[in-house]
Amino acid sequence: MNLYAESSGVLAWLLGDSGGESVRKALASAEIVLASYLTLIECNRILIRTGATGRLTEAQVATREARLRQVETHWTLLEMDAEIVERARRPFPLEPIRTLDAIHLATALVARSAVPGIALLSLDDRVRRCGRQLGFELLPA
């Protein structure tokens, strides 16, 4: 199984939120994990926010940041190039879609052109519904 990791899924795993264990299993069993640099930015920003608001201690934030840094070394990270920007600027099957979600979906589409059959790993309902319309297998199932 190959997958594109969208931020909501990765964050659920890092934060131990609902669905996080299913995400962990999907990431662990994937042959290839592709993600946008946007995924890393969003995850780190949320981790910083959870520390700043007291949801997690500094040590807990550091542990989760280290965990993310460890797994990202095994992922194929995609930059936001002109093809992704152009696709994100166009309509998606289910609108409205948020800007960052459009970037993730556009990146997943570009990833799928390089790795056919790639699944979309997301826990965000809008991203999942749109991904289904775009023909992605969704993880977790």
Regions found by a protein language model. Give the residues of each.
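Alpha-helical elements of the RecA-like P-loop NTPase motor core of helicases
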Residues: A12, E21, E86, R128-R129
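Short active-site oxyanion
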Residues: M1, A30-V33, H74-T76, V115-A119
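Hydrophobic core segments within long, regular secondary-structure runs in both alpha-
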Residues: A62-R69, V85, R128
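Acidic, PIN/NYN-like endoribonuclease modules and their adjacent C-terminal/linker elements
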Residues: N2, L105-A106, V110-A141
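Short, well-structured N-terminal submotif of metal-dependent ribonuclease cores
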Residues: M1-I41, T50-T63, F136
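Short beta-strand scaffold positions
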Residues: A35, E79, T99-A102, L121-S122
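Acidic catalytic patch
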Residues: L40, Q70-E95, A102-T107
